[in-house]
Amino acid sequence: MSHHRSAFFISDRTGITAESLGHTLLTQFDALDFQRETVPFVDTVEKARALAERISEIAERDHLRPLVFTSIVNPEVREALRLNNVVLIDFFESFIGHLEIELGQKATLTVGKAHGMVNEEKYDHRIEAVNFSLNHDDGVKLKDLHEADVILVGVSRSGKTPTCLYLALQYGIRAANYPLTPEDLGSPTLPKMLLPFKDKMFGLTIDPNRLHHIRSERRPDSKYASMDNCRREVNEAESMFRHHGVPFISTTHKSIEEIASTIMHKAALGRKF
């Protein structure tokens, strides 16, 4: 039996939904190697037929049915992708009918509602949150910190910046971050500029070995990246968090998505759009 399988994530818009749901399912099959391809903006029957022809050729080449995950609103476009030599997993067809029955209402079947700019006010809020996080990255801008929903604090390279941007983009959270420097860590006292915002602080920590590896790629053979320094910084940062009752989590074995979701839950933050 071949351990190689083609998988397509097809959508009439960005492809984010089909890709995310399909990828989640495929991660449960570790022994298989999936050749993944995302195909967005398949919004006409003509486009669907052309794509179906290409997928059919791949099925003949591989002697295996490709896996086709779709999140397409238009039933005619969906039908054009229904082939005998593919496994079609249609997220819309699988769930929308059950919801219509339960809710007693027909779905509007409007393309682009999940990831399109349907509501300008919500979209603007999302962009404002991203700009806020960019402007308040790495402690560069300390003004307006009172407008932050959360302030991530941690040693350098503990995952603060990508987490802030993900919180802004995915949840509309105004997330600032502040890097704990050696000067900050010399005392258990919180950095002076953060004292008024203690209730908004959330700490990120990381395993010293992992931190050493990350820093060594950036600045090899430096004191900054040395194992002793990484261990000291992490220990002092965690002591500071505990001393002041600042909640914190380890980012060592977590993805950005997991870190952000954990912060949303533990800090009792709500989605802003």
Swiss-Prot record:
Enzyme class: transferase
InterPro entries reported in the protein's UniProt record: Kinase-pyrophosphorylase, PSRP
EC number(s) reported in the record: 2.7.11.33, 2.7.4.28
UniProt protein name: Putative phosphoenolpyruvate synthase regulatory protein
The keyword Transferase appears for this protein: yes
Regions annotated as coiled coil: none
Molecular function GO terms recorded: ADP binding; ATP binding; phosphotransferase activity, phosphate group as acceptor; protein serine/threonine kinase activity
Reactions catalysed, as given in the entry: [pyruvate, water dikinase] + ADP = [pyruvate, water dikinase]-phosphate + AMP + H(+); [pyruvate, water dikinase]-phosphate + phosphate + H(+) = [pyruvate, water dikinase] + diphosphate
Keywords: Kinase, Nucleotide-binding, Serine/threonine-protein kinase, Transferase
Record HAMAP family: PSRP
Function: Bifunctional serine/threonine kinase and phosphorylase involved in the regulation of the phosphoenolpyruvate synthase (PEPS) by catalyzing its phosphorylation/dephosphorylation.
Claim: Transferase is one of the keywords in the record: yes
Family according to the record: Belongs to the pyruvate, phosphate/water dikinase regulatory protein family. PSRP subfamily.
Record-listed ADP binding positions: G154, V155, S156, R157, S158, G159, K160, T161
